Amino acid sequence: MTRRYSSRLIAVWLFALLACPPTKAGNAALTPTPPMGWNSWDSYGRTITEAQFKANADWMAAHLKRFGWQYMVIDEGWYVLNPESAPKDYKFLVNDSGQFLPVPSRFPPTANGAGFKPLADYVHSLGLKFGLHIIRGIPREAVAKNLAIEGSSYHAADAADRSDACPWNAYNYGVKSSEAGQAYYDSIAKLYASWNVDFIKADCIADHPYKPEEIRMLASAIKKTGRPMVLSLSPGPTALENASEVSKYAEMWRICDDFWDHWGPWEKHDWSQSLYQQFATAAKWAPHVAPGGWPDADMLPLGHLGPHPGDGVLRETRFTKDEQRTMMTLWSIFRSPLIIGGDLVSADEWTTSLLTNPEVIAVDQHSYENRAVITTDTVAVWLARGGDSGVYYRTDQGHYIAVFNIGDSEQTIHHDWKDLGLTEKSYKIRDLWERENLGNAQSLTVKLKPHASVLYLVQGKR
């Protein structure tokens, strides 16, 4: 190689490095793209059994895995002995080290002390990954009995902060920012690693209240195990001012309170995030999206929500088909993690089509510079570059444009390309949902029904 040729390569490499957006190098290898998977809460609440979980895992492996879906996550309550009772009457399975264990009556292979390892191994045999949900802190029962913390000289009472229980969940006390507190988090992370867990969703930690000390302790404990485990923080809304902090320790974090299947405000829960509200929230968080750290717009309540949804009655999603497609489009152009909430086994042809469109999934997994370029009370337009942007490289495959009618009446939306920051006079348009080419256009004009949307790939001259 000549010196001139070598210097040119170095110059190209430096340009590519400087041109790329910031990335979380410590976590980028674990989650270089937004995680995609399924969570049990929206359909099963605290009641899911091993048989039900396996059935959903089998369905994912058969129908979704080839499109990039991989995480199978058991949400809250796997340690609750009587999940269909009132929460005040719950009884828990806690071992002699003060750690929650899965209930054998719902997860039979755990009866011999194997914990979730047999189930995780089953999920892995399908080519998928296994995750579970925890509430921050230490079980109250462990503190009452002052159980020894495994691998340390401390006991539960040493670690517990009795003044800092989760205000909306009575299972645990908080954990002190101390050697004893760290020892407890070390013990549960070690346990989960021994079960071959790949994903931990930690709740009552990202907001109401925000617990940065416990986030740091949990992240440190996970790192000590040596096992790669995604850390997902919940609930939201994570405060924007905490973005740089949470991104140091977690791979994803919730940007809103619980998201359910309603376009506007929900009378039952005024705190529940609506799809309409999610547009403004996503726009604020878009600058913080980066490989290794993904603002999370919450689960996708699609299809059949049952038999025991985490909130409300058994139902088919309340979203219209237009709203379902709009939700998938917003999550994708924003690059949120994609975590399905509906029962997979019950998925119909329409729901399956939303989850298996490779061109839409590519927007979520392989785009960059994602941002809202036009926002009014009734219209939202998002723009992103098509291709990949990593630590040392960037590819350019045109632009993605998402146009949303977020108003309550039909409208025609028109913009010149320059309104969107695009410089060429004419662009070739491809409709990603319909998977068809629409030809060349000198401007953008879309007629949309209420709450409907389109997602386009636009390419200029090459």
Where are each of the predicted segments found?
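Sec/Tat signal peptide C-region and signal peptidase I cleavage site
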Residues: 21-25
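Bacterial N-terminal signal peptides
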Residues: 10-19
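Aromatic-lined carbohydrate-binding/catalytic grooves of carbohydrate-active enzymes
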Residues: 61-122, 126-204
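Structural recognition of the beta-strand scaffold that forms the well-ordered cores
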Residues: 35-40, 70-75, 80, 129-134, ...
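Carbohydrate-binding surface patches
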Residues: 331-334, 339-341, 375-422
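Glycan-recognition surfaces
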Residues: 161-163, 174-183, 230-343
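C-terminal beta-sandwich/jelly-roll accessory domains of carbohydrate-active enzymes
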Residues: 396-398, 402-462
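Catalytic cores of secreted or luminal carbohydrate-active enzymes
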Residues: 326-375
